[in-house]
Amino acid sequence: MTKEGKILKALSGFYYVNCSGEIVTCRARGNFRNENITPLVGDDVKIQMSDNNTGYVVEILERKNELLRPKVANIDYSIIVVSVKDPEFSSKLLNKTICLNENSDVNIIIIFTKLDLLKDAELENMKEIMNYYYEIGYQVFTNSEEDIDKLKEVISNKYVAISGQSGAGKSTFINKLAEHLDIETGEISKHLGRGRHTTRHTEFYQIDDFYIADTPGFSSLDITFIEKEDLQYLFREFHDYDCKFKPCNHMEEIQCGVKEAVESKQILESRYEDYKVLFTEKQNQKRKYIKER
């Protein structure tokens, strides 16, 4: 007997598939491994039922999108949780995460946490940063009760992936979304300024009328697969400005509309500086590869 469903959890080689409200524990057919294909949480699949009420994933239906961090498929929103204190706010890490999501063409929501730990001047500066991301088209929330209620309206009947820096408060944020869940939370290591990786696997939790996946935290991200020439297209506000010479990488070129926008404060300086750092890293990465050949 064949059924269709969605993978809600992947753990130790087992896939937990929701088939019209029934959770079926499945293994993947060996041909997936032979073809180097891995079923992902969020995949819509066909399963073949076994006699003991378990099953085998026999087909993965076409994905509408796929994220690398977290490793999930077919999501409606990607929520990026960002700490502004303990660990310190990292614009570079935020912008790298945004690049990964933009590259997968996924709707992005940014959650800023721990604003209560900031002093007045720090808070005003952070509000300006938050407003900038809102102005360039991202949905921006805090972890306040009021914002959580607004967020629930946005993600109603949706599948959502949540990611962020270790210690940013992802699990705590999910527990605020639904008090009946009790996801393990870890204390911040004061010595490292990083959180413990309390989430060990990827799983969609049903909360009210939506599903949300919490995944292992991270302190760094790998975007080696993105070409340096493509980075500019992942910084969405750059599209609004014209440059005299095309193609323009917005680095050393003259009469560059993006650089002029930075100087006139239309583009957030820290965001452009992060772009330059990422571009240079990609450039050095390619030079190292050529040298090693």
Regions found by a protein language model. Give the residues of each.
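SH3/SH3-like beta-barrel fold
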Residues: 15-19, 26, 47, 57
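Canonical P-loop GTPase G-domain recognition
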Residues: 117-168
